Design a protein with these regions (language model features):
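Non-transmembrane, aqueous-exposed alpha-helical and coiled segments at domain scale
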Residues: 2-484
C-alpha cells in the first residue's frame, strides 16, 4: 500500500470519527418526547390511533376497500380493489380469453373507461412509437455512472429526460398527458438497459441491448429485452402481465402516490414529480418490501431443516418476531396492510398464478413453505401484538417469489413495481392538476424551546451546567469529610 493510500485511510478514519461525534449531537437535538405526539393528538403517518388513514383528498382513479360499513361500524371484509370503478378481479378474469391486459389497464386508468378494439389498437401504436430511446440517450445517460440500485438509475434517467423535452415545464393537461404516456412507454427500457449496464460495467458480464418488438405486450418485451436469448414461455409472460396489472394502481394514499399529489400540488414539472415518486417507492417500507420478503424466505430456508414441519417453521417465525433472527427488526415481511383486513385481493390473485408457475418450474416445495408461513404468520402477529385487527398477507408476499421464478434479478424487483405503478401515478397527477388549486401544506407544531441568540464569544466560553454544579458540590463534601 502506498503512502498516499495509507494517508487516505487515516483521513477516512478521522472523518468517520468526526461524523460519529456530530451524530451524537444530532441524536440528542432531534429526539422528540413520544408522549408529546399523544398530548397533541398528532396523526403519525397520517393515520388515526386505529391505523386508519386520515382523509386528505378525493379520487376517482381507484378504490381500495377492506371493510364493510354496517350500522355505522366498520366490519372487516375480504379486500376489494377497483380501477375506475371496475373490480380488478373482473379485469383478471377477463384475461382468460385474452393473453394480456396491462396495456388495456393503462388505458382504463388514464382515460376512465375500457377501450374498444379500435381505441386499443390505436393506443398500442402510439405507445410503441413513444417507447423509443435515442442511441445518444442510451449511450450518454443510461450507460454512464452505472448503479447497483436501478431505482436510483431510473430517477437519474427520468430527470435527464427533462433536458430532452422541448416543453418540459408546461403543466397543461395535454402536455402532461404526453409526458406521462412517454414515461410509461420508456420506463421499462430504462430499467432493463440500466440493469444491463450495471452487469456489464460493475460485474464485467456480456452487454446486450435488445429493442422491443412491435406486436408484443409489455410483459413479453420485458422478458425479451432482459434475457440473453430473448426466450420465454407463454405462462411466464402471462404471469408477469398479471403482476403488472395488480401493481398498476392502489389509491391516492399510498406513499408514492401521495408523493405524486404533494409534489404535483407545488406546480412542478412531470419529470420531477415522477422522480420523487420513484424515490418513495424505493424505500423498504413501500415498494422495496418485496425484496425484504425474498431475503426473509432465503433466511428461513437456510435455518429451517424441514420446510413442511409446522412446529419447526412456527418456532423460527417466533424468533423473527422476537428480534432473535433474520434482520432483528421483529417484522415478518409481506404480512399486514393499512387498509386490507381479511385479505388483499392482489395477493389472492397473484398466489394463484404463483402456484401455476411453481408447478411449471418444479418449485412446489418452496410454494408450500410460502403457504405455510402465510397460514401461521397472521395469527402469530395478531396474538403477539395484541391487535384487534386481522393481519393478512399483502401483494409483496408472493411477488418476489414470482419474480425469482421468472428469472428476474433482485435488482429489478422494485423497478418492475415502478414500471407497473407509472400509469397510476400519472392518473393521479392529472387528477391533482385538474381538481386542486392549493399546495398541500399540513401543519407541524413546534415543541422545542425559544432561547436567546449568543455571540461567538459567549458560545466559546465554557458553559457551567447543573451537572457541573452537582459534581463540584459532591467534590466539596468529600473534601470536607477528608479534613474531619
Amino acid at each position: 500500500m502506498s503512502n498516499n493510500e495509507v494517508m487516505k485511510l487515516e483521513e477516512d478514519k478521522e472523518l468517520k470519527g468526526e461524523f460519529k461525534e456530530l451524530c451524537k449531537a444530532l441524536r440528542n437535538n432531534h429526539r422528540i418526547n413520544p408522549n408529546l405526539y399523544v398530548e397533541y393528538d398528532v396523526k403519525r403517518g397520517l393515520r388515526d390511533s386505529a391505523g386508519k388513514g386520515v382523509l386528505t383528498g378525493l379520487t376517482e382513479v381507484s378504490d381500495v376497500t377492506g371493510y364493510n360499513l354496517i350500522n355505522g361500524r366498520n366490519i372487516p371484509a375480504e379486500g376489494r380493489l377497483y380501477y375506475q370503478g371496475i373490480n380488478v378481479n373482473d379485469i383478471v378474469d377477463s384475461l382468460k380469453d385474452r393473453k394480456f391486459g396491462f396495456e388495456e389497464t393503462v388505458y382504463l386508468l388514464m382515460f376512465g373507461h375500457l377501450p374498444n378494439k379500435t381505441e386499443l389498437e390505436h393506443f398500442l401504436d402510439v405507445m410503441f412509437e413513444l417507447q423509443e430511446l435515442s442511441g445518444r440517450f442510451v449511450r450518454d445517460v443510461v450507460m454512464k455512472a452505472s448503479n447497483e440500485n436501478i431505482m436510483n438509475a431510473m430517477q437519474r434517467c427520468v430527470l435527464t429526460l427533462y433536458s430532452y423535452d422541448e416543453n418540459p415545464d408546461d403543466i397543461s393537461p395535454e402536455n402532461v398527458l404526453r409526458q406521462a404516456l412517454e414515461l410509461i412507454a420508456k420506463l421499462p427500457l430504462i430499467a432493463v438497459y440500466s440493469y444491463h449496464s450495471y452487469r456489464h460495467f460493475r460485474k464485467d458480464e456480456m452487454l446486450f441491448i435488445r429493442n422491443p418488438e412491435k406486436g408484443l405486450s409489455l410483459a413479453e418485451n420485458i422478458l425479451l429485452m432482459l434475457r440473453p436469448k430473448g426466450e420465454y414461455t407463454e405462462l411466464e409472460a402471462k404471469v408477469l402481465d398479471i403482476a403488472l396489472v395488480l401493481h398498476a394502481e392502489h389509491g391516492g394514499g399510498n406513499n408514492s402516490t401521495f408523493t405524486t399529489h404533494v409534489v404535483t400540488s407545488s406546480g412542478t414539472d412531470t419529470y420531477s414529480s415522477v422522480a420523487a415518486s420513484i424515490g418513495s417507492l424505493k424505500g423498504p417500507r413501500h415498494g422495496g418490501a418485496n425484496l425484504k420478503v425474498q431475503n426473509m424466505f432465503d433466511d428461513i430456508k437456510a435455518h429451517v431443516k424441514n420446510w413442511g414441519n409446522e412446529e419447526e417453521v412456527g418456532a423460527y417465525l417466533h424468533k423473527i418476531l422476537n428480534k432473535e433472527a433474520f434482520d432483528h427488526s421483529g417484522l415478518i415481511y409481506g404480512m399486514g396492510h393499512a387498509v386490507y383486513t381479511l385479505s388483499d385481493p392482489r395477493e389472492v390473485i397473484l398466489k394463484r398464478f404463483a402456484k401455476a408457475l411453481a408447478e411449471e418450474k418444479g418449485r412446489m416445495k418452496e410454494f408450500a413453505l410460502y403457504e405455510l408461513v402465510e397460514s401461521l404468520a397472521g395469527k402469530m402477529i395478531k396474538e403477539q401484538r395484541n391487535l384487534q385487527k386481522n393481519v393478512c398477507a399483502n401483494v409483496d408476499f408472493y411477488s418476489g417469489f414470482v419474480y425469482s421464478m421468472l428469472g428476474i434479478p433482485q435488482e429489478l424487483f422494485t423497478p418492475i413495481f415502478a414500471i407497473a405503478r407509472m400509469p397510476g401515478w400519472s392518473a393521479h397527477r392529472l387528477e391533482e392538476l385538474t381538481n386542486a388549486n392549493k399546495i398541500i401544506r399540513p401543519a407541524y407544531k413546534y415543541v422545542g424551546h425559544h432561547t436567546e441568540f449568543e455571540t461567538m464569544e459567549e458560545r466559546s466560553a465554557e458553559k457551567i451546567t447543573d451537572e457541573d454544579v452537582k459534581e463540584e458540590l459532591e467534590k466539596c463534601k468529600k473534601e470536607e469529610k477528608g479534613k474531619k
